[in-house]
Amino acid sequence: MPRTRGPNAASRELEEAHERLAKKDEEIGQLRARLAQRDASRRGSGIEPENIVWIFCSGRTGSSWLSRMMGELEGHTVWFEPWVGALVDPYHLQLDRRKGAHFILSSQYRATWLASIRSLVLDGADARFPETGSKDYLIIKEPGGSVGAPLLMEALPESRMIFLIRDPRDVVASWADAHKKGSWLSADEGPEASAERARRAASRYVRNIGQAKRAYDAHRGRKALIKYEDLREDALGTMKRSYSQLGVTVDEGELSRAVEKHSWENIPEEDKGEGKFYRKATPGGWREDLTPEQVEIVEHIVAPLLKEFYPESQPNVGG
């Protein structure tokens, strides 16, 4: 017969559990106090968390163009692809499966490692951009690291964010061109490899954009959603609207000059075209660039995102 615990033993276990929880709450409170003290001590001498503007997106969505326009403005500095978000990639780390206390990102120690992520970003920024003042803005262009966007925004909730999106079919078409023989990424591939690359590119897009959207939806601070297609149609108007949503005041004349300087029309012709980094900049160009097989593959993988952000674009699957 299994022995049953008496009421005294059960009471002691419950009391011990309460003590452990109280101790954990005390540790978290102390950690938050240290974090606040740390931020207070660095205030006025480095980049302020609320002056960080993240650009979360996927590759080939126009983030280089956007960040260069923003970088032209007074008091703006661009941190070009630090990949810090890749360090907390939920897919690679299997965050939904690893629950043990010994796991470095265990939920039991969330406050501890969020503080570490925060310090990594702020200290890394201060070390790289010591000339950037407390009133200046740091634009962090983070396409590859967008997979870690939710945790980055949780660690730095005061920061602002731009969610940059582009039709995934155009994104895949751009990557397909980049990997052709003689192109700027110089990779030769046959028809089978081309189909597989489309599948991988679409899956990568879903991971990065999906996590960026998750961060955008959860963020309660200043944020802006920018579509690449809107930038191409009216870059100045889109930039004005986005800065207003971000709560950042900029000089309209300076902004207009930045937009003009980095317009598609002002890129030298020899730097544009197929096989070049600046390839096409034509929304909907995927209709000419992708094979029917590639289109079907991509539209199947990205269907929910297409439905939400490009509902006017009817999938070509089966047609």
Walk through the language-model features, giving the residues of each.
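PAPS-dependent sulfotransferases, especially Golgi type II membrane carbohydrate sulfotransferases
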Residues: 1-53, 176-179, 185, 209-217, ...
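PAPS-dependent sulfotransferase catalytic core
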Residues: 3-124
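PAPS-dependent sulfotransferase catalytic domain
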Residues: 84, 92-93, 133-253, 264-277
